[in-house]
Swiss-Prot record:
This is Hydroxylamine reductase. Catalyzes the reduction of hydroxylamine to form NH(3) and H(2)O. It comes from the Bacteria. [4Fe-4S] cluster binds at residues 3, 6, 15, 21. One of its GO terms (cellular component) is cytoplasm. Keywords: 4Fe-4S, Cytoplasm, Iron, Iron-sulfur, Metal-binding, Oxidoreductase. It comes from Parabacteroides distasonis (strain ATCC 8503 / DSM 20701 / CIP 104284 / JCM 5825 / NCTC 11152). Coiled coil: none annotated. InterPro entries: HCP/CODH, Hydroxylam_reduct, Prismane-like_a/b-sand, Prismane-like_sf, Prismane_a-bundle. The lineage of its organism: Bacteria, Pseudomonadati, Bacteroidota, Bacteroidia, Bacteroidales. One of its GO terms (molecular function) is metal ion binding. The gene is hcp.
Amino acid sequence: MFCYQCQETAQGKGCTLKGVCGKTAEVAGLQDLLMYLMKGISKLTTTLRKQGVESSTANKFIVDGLFMTITNANFDSSRFVSKIKEAYQLRENLLNELHRLGIHLSLTCDCLTWKSDKVEEMEVKAKEVGILATENEDIRSLCELLTYGVKGMAAYVEHAYNLGFEDTSLYAFMQDALVATTRSDLTVADLTQWVLTCGEYGVKAMALLDKANTSTYGNPEITKVNIGVGKNPGILISGHDLRDIQDLLEQTEGTGIDVYTHGEMLPAHYYPAFKKYKHFVGNYGSAWWKQTSDFETFNGVILFTTNCLVPPRSSATYADRVYTTGSTGFEGFPHIADRKPGGSKDFSALIEHAKKCAPPTEIEHGEIIGGFAHEQVFQLADKVIDAVKSGAIRKFFVMAGCDGRMKSRSYYTEFAEKLPKDTVILTAGCAKYRYNKLPLGEIRGIPRVLDAGQCNDSYSLVMIALKLKEIFGLDDVNELPIAYNIAWYEQKAVIVLLALLYLGVKNIHLGPTLPAFLSPNVAKVLVDNFGIAGIGSVDEDMELFLGK
C-alpha cells in the first residue's frame, strides 16, 4: 500500500504497511481501485453530460464512493468490495446509455473495462493503479491535491444532498476533476489551475451546505452547551450529518434515552430546531482521537454518521455498542441502512440497545459556548466594529481546522493561552477542542473564542471576513487585522484551504506539518504565490503575527 492523504502519515512520507489511521493494506488497495473505477465512470458521465444527460445514480455513487475513502471513514473491506462490484454494473449501464445515443468511446483506459469479482485479483490490480502509478512527482502531487480537494467537497455535497439540496455543477466539476487526473497531456501549470478551480467549487459546496443547514434548522445562535451528564442511558452521536441527528432525536423522544453529541457533532446544539428536544442533554468527551477513552466511560450506544472513527483497541469494552451509518464502516459494527426517499433512517436497534445500558459516567462538568456562525456574528457587528476601532480588539486569529493525535498539536493550546487579551480566536472544526474549554475570557462581552461550528462552517469565517472588509471599506481581505493559523488533518481541511486560496486569502500558516503529498516544487508554488507557511515555536510565531 501507499497512502499519504492525511497529516499523520507515517514519518511524514507515507503509510506503506498499515495506515496510521488503522486501515489495512487490503482496505487501502480496495480504496485505490474504487477511485480508479470512479475515474472511468466519470469519463462516461462527462461524455453523457455533453449530450444533455445527467445520471443522478452516478452522481450519488461517486459522492458516496469519494466520502468512503476519506481518512477515518470506512475500514470495512466487504463494503469496498460491494462498492467495486456496483461500479462494474454502473459502468455497464452508462456504456449502454452511450451506445443508445450512438456514441462509441475508444476504451483505451482499462478503468473502463477492467473487471474481476475475485478479491485477490482486485488487490493485485490496486497495486497497478495506486498513487505511485503516476511517476512524475509534481504531476502526482497536483493530481493528489486535486483528488483530496474533491474528496472533501464530496463530504459537503453529501450532507447537503441528505437535506434535499443539490447543485449539479458540483457533480460536474468533481467528475471533470477526476477525469483530469487521468490525462497525460496536462502540464503542471494546467493542473495548478485545476487545483485553484477546485477551491472555487469548494466555496460553492460550502455555501450550498450552509444554505441546506440553515434553511432546514435555522441559523446557529449563541448557545451554552452542557458538558456534564444526565441520569438516563444515552446514545452518543459522532460525525457531521445533521439529518442523522434529526432522525435520532425524533425517534428517541419519549423513550427515556438521552442523546449526546461527540466531536464534530457538537455544533448541532447551536441550531434552533434541535433546542426543543429536552432529552438532547449535551456534548460528551473531546476531539475524535480521544474516543478510545471517552467511549469507555460513556457506557451507552455510539453512532458514527461520518468519518472520525478510530479502530477500537483489542481491550475495548465499548466495541459491541458501536453502530455506523452513511459512509462509515468497520468490520463487526452493525450498519444502519440509508433512508428511503421521503423517509427516515431506522434507529430502533440503537434505542433498544441503549435501554439496556448504564447512564454515562461524568468525566467533566460545566458549559462551553458556541454558535458564532456568520448570521449571529453579523448581529454583533456593531459591538465588534466598536471594539476594533477602539483598540479593544487588536487582531483576530482564524484557528479553524482539525485536531489529531500528534503531541506537537499541543502548540495550538499553548498558542491560544499565550495570545494577548486583546485578541479573538475565530474557529470551526474539531481544532477547537485544543482551547474551547480554556478560561480565555471576553472582550466587552464578546467571548475570546468564537466557534462557528463544524469544519464546513469555515465558510462562516470567510463570510465574516468579507463582511468586515466591506464595513471597513478595504480593497483586499488581507488588509484586515486577521491572521490565519490553521491546523489540518484530512481531506475536508484540504478543500477549506483551497477555498481560502481561491478567495484570495494569503499568508496562511498550516500545521502541525505541511502535507506529505506536496512535492517540493508544488510547495514552492504555494509559498511563492500565496505565502503558505508552516508553524515554528509558539513564541516565534507570536512575534511573527504580532510583532515584539
